[in-house]
Design a protein with these regions (language model features):
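Glycine-rich, aromatic-lined ligand/substrate-binding cores of catalytic
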Residues: 3-133, 141-144, 150-200, 204-213
């Protein structure tokens, strides 16, 4: 069993005319969001890991270790460590390593491609389906369901945190709950400190569309 902590904050955009709060639509995303995940230490990491998602124009401050001459772009990934950081554009393109005490990005050389064949991971996926569950082709997948399932769970928990921040304190109240740290028990698939947030984790399917899992 592993637990996660998630919290999110989103803006309320006022009308320019009279500065009355804009309506909130459950069917659409907020104009921007800031989501923080906290992962407890585990067998593969001996300390807490914090991951932050930003969108809608929100950006982190320019790290001091990266000089003002280096462009870090508008979208991307920033991994901060004790002795340096790794920056890349979106989808991990053009990754660069910066180490404290060294000027500029560190040259790490070209990394060789793995199984560089046409339609690489797509072909591996088809081969695994043909070979069947538990086959060598299945075990060798670089992104099988054992990995992709928890990854999707993490992303969707961020959406649950965003939607939870837009819950009102009571049916008659105009005050929103706002940012609240949610405690998640993945084994039970349950948010343990805000029961109303659990409505965003599952849904009631129409007759004939049940998943039966």
């Amino acid at each position: 069993m592993y637990k996660r902590q998630i919290e999110a904050s989103v803006p309320r955009v006022p009308y320019v005319a009279d500065f009355t709060p804009a309506p909130v639509y459950e069917e659409s995303c907020p104009p921007s969001s800031y989501v923080t995940y906290r992962f407890r230490p585990s067998k593969i990491n001996d300390s807490e890991v914090k991951m932050i998602w930003m969108d809608g124009g929100i950006r982190p401050s320019h790290p001091e270790i990266i000089t003002d001459k280096d462009q870090i772009g508008d979208n991307g990934i920033l991994m901060l460590g004790e002795n340096g950081l790794i920056w890349s554009d979106y989808y991990g393109v053009n990754a660069r390593l910066y180490i404290k005490g060294q000027k500029g990005a560190v040259e790490v050389g070209k990394i060789s491609e793995i199984n560089s064949v046409e339609f690489g991971h797509q072909k591996h996926w088809v081969d695994a389906i043909k070979a069947g569950f538990g086959s060598e082709e299945h075990k060798n997948l670089t992104s099988n369901f054992d990995f992709a399932g928890p990854l999707s769970e993490i992303v969707l928990l961020g959406n649950a945190a965003i939607r939870s921040s837009l819950l009102k304190r009571s049916p008659r109240s105009n005050i929103y709950i706002g940012r609240k740290q949610l405690l998640y028990d993945s084994k039970k698939m349950e948010i343990t400190n805000l029961d109303r947030a659990n409505q965003f984790l599952t849904r009631k399917y129409r007759n004939g569309w049940d998943l039966n899992v």
